[in-house]
Amino acid sequence: MAISTTKPSLLPPVPQRLFSRHDLIPPRQDVLWRIERGAVRTVTWSEQGTLITLGYWGMGDLVGQPLSRVVPYQIECLTSVETSIVPPELWHQTIDSMLSHIQQSEELLSIIHRKPVSLRLWQFLVWLAEKFGRDVDQGRLIDLGVTHQEMAEVINTTRVSVTRMLQQFEEQGMLLRHQRRLILCLPIQRFRM
């Protein structure tokens, strides 16, 4: 982990920190973390130890304990991540990012209540494609490695069910696999929420 000071686009100079894949970003009460590069997920777990995914966050998003009342609360790096520390005196300058945080949380909440589970998985893939994807010749590449287990945790099903549904989507021509990534093959407009 390295610390440096740089100047993000709209904020005065703030300390930056680098984290490696699988690192945990400290959930401090006194700062928010702006994701400058990379992707993280926020999680908690139930009394029985079941992992509960709260959100997936990427470039420009804010995360941090001050945005959540959930305890326990953990920020896990899914890739190498560069963050800026945003202290409370600068929070008023982050309203757009905070609104985006709320909107994304509500989008995920609506996805996890979809039925049947296959629709829930498909809508989650669409959401990932919109947030972390890029256009390629075959469709929209989800440029984030999300495991079948991680997908299962988000949509509240089993890893085996996710694997089976992904195979069905592939057989139906809805997605392709490319170097451990997924490509959604239908035009994005056809399967938006």
Spans of model-derived segments:
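A structural signal for short hydrophobic beta-strand segments in well-ordered beta-sheet cores
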Residues: 33, 75, 174-175
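Cyclic-nucleotide recognition modules
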Residues: 52-107
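Polybasic "coupling" helices that flank or enter modular domains
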Residues: 96-157
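Surface loops and adjacent helix of pleckstrin homology
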Residues: 37, 45-47, 68, 87-88, ...
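Glycine- and acidic-residue-biased ligand/ion/polar-headgroup-sensing regions
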Residues: 29-45, 58-60
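Short acidic-glycine-tyrosine-enriched beta hairpin
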Residues: 15-24, 46-63
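Phosphate-/nucleic-acid-contacting segments
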Residues: 132-193
